[in-house]
Amino acid sequence: VSNAFWSDLSAAVFGKAVPSYSVQGSGHLPSFYKVSDFAEASVGLAGVALARFWDGGADQVLVDRRLASLWFYMTLWADGWKASGLWDAIAGDYQCRDGWIRLHTNAPHHRDVALLVLGTKADRAAVAKAVLTWRGVELESAVVAAGGCGAQMRLPHDWAEHPQGRAIAAEPLVHWDDHGVCAPTAAPEGPSLRGLKVLDLTRVLAGPVATRFLAGFGADVLRIDPPFWNEPSVEMEVTLSKCCAGLDLRIETDLEHLKQLMREADVFVHGYRADALDRLGIGTEVRRELNPTLVDVRLNAYGWSGPWVNRRGFDSLVQMSCGIAGLGMELSGSDRPKPLPVQALDHGAGYLVAACILEALSARRKGRLKSAKVSLARVAHLLMANRCEWDTSGAIKQIPSDFNATVENTGWGPAHRVKSPLQINGVTPH
């Protein structure tokens, strides 16, 4: 296929551009960026990485462009019940004295911080009134300093001149660390990831997309959350085919339990801020001592260098920071920020993380140890290099035939899932 993203993605993961996948389906998600091209290439990347792990090649990989675009959104069609809303009542974009800012308040402790900084009650109108009294950069700094999540809307040229924007532009798409050798491991048995133990310390949305992909092909994924964390609006998306448990890593016994899980795992994927595990006493060197052959892949929001390396962030905030939402507003003539039609940074980064995990596992089979780091902001940098015109002809929207006919009995009620966008030699996720 001809895809603007393939050479960059494949070179970042495999060290060189490799033959591409096959594609079927058509259409696109209307945007000022090539979002559907990115969705197709991201799913294809993970598929090719899995085919290589199974000693196959890209010629075995078939991606459905339409379905890949739909898998960049919510994939479940509730039958007779209604899923929770995606956003907290306070979360969203607000006008400030000199532009716009986005507050991310889905987590109760992040909402509490925003309200404390603003000195107002949990009422959207009151929050909007309070935000209007602030300059954007000052409110962003105050919320972040207090432990919350917010992002001032910038334009691409603002981000290019910002210290963090410059740092991101200088980073590779994937930070690889070739850190040792080991005894070669056995080849997998057949087209499956059965028996692969994946320890998942990630939250909405990129990391869970990566581990959902692995779980779909049979990996044993154990997701660990702190007791205070809750994702009711996306649980049916991010816990598919996984086991879930809770640990409070501030408690010594729970931390020791996590260490034991690390010793037993094949893969550890985590999305905490860059310094979080170091502060818990389980930094990179400690993890390698616990399990020398552990495949360790990390994800964060704002990259691995620069002044924002430890900043909290989510897809919607990165879109505001780097200029995606601002440029969308400018080009569309909208009176408010216009982000991507889907959280493409999260989903694209998720499939990139999955591909990195599989490539590191392929290296381990040959006796080489590799770890990787990925960020939403660097994924955004790639996407922003691939602009397009807004076009609603051929726009992709969910229709009943996009969903599996088989009922999926979830913990919330019966539902239908969007069909798989990927086949590898005829094998699809289950």
Task: Set out the residue ranges of the language-model regions.
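Acyl-CoA thioester-binding alpha/beta core of soluble enzymes
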Residues: V1-F228, L255, K259-E264, R287-G303, ...
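A structured beta-alpha segment of the ubiquitous adenosine-cofactor-binding alpha/beta core
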Residues: L199, C243-E289
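Short glycine-/small-residue-rich Rossmann-like dinucleotide-binding loops
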Residues: R203, L249, R273-A274, N300-A301, ...
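Domain-scale recognition of functional cores that engage charged ligands
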Residues: P208-V209, P232-S233, L249, K259, ...
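Short, well-ordered alpha-helix to beta-strand connector turns
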Residues: G218, S241-K242, A265, F314
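Glycine-rich phosphate-binding loop and adjoining beta1-alpha1-beta2 segment
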Residues: A219, R223-L249, H257
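Rossmann-fold NAD(P)-binding glycine/threonine-rich loop
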Residues: R279-G326
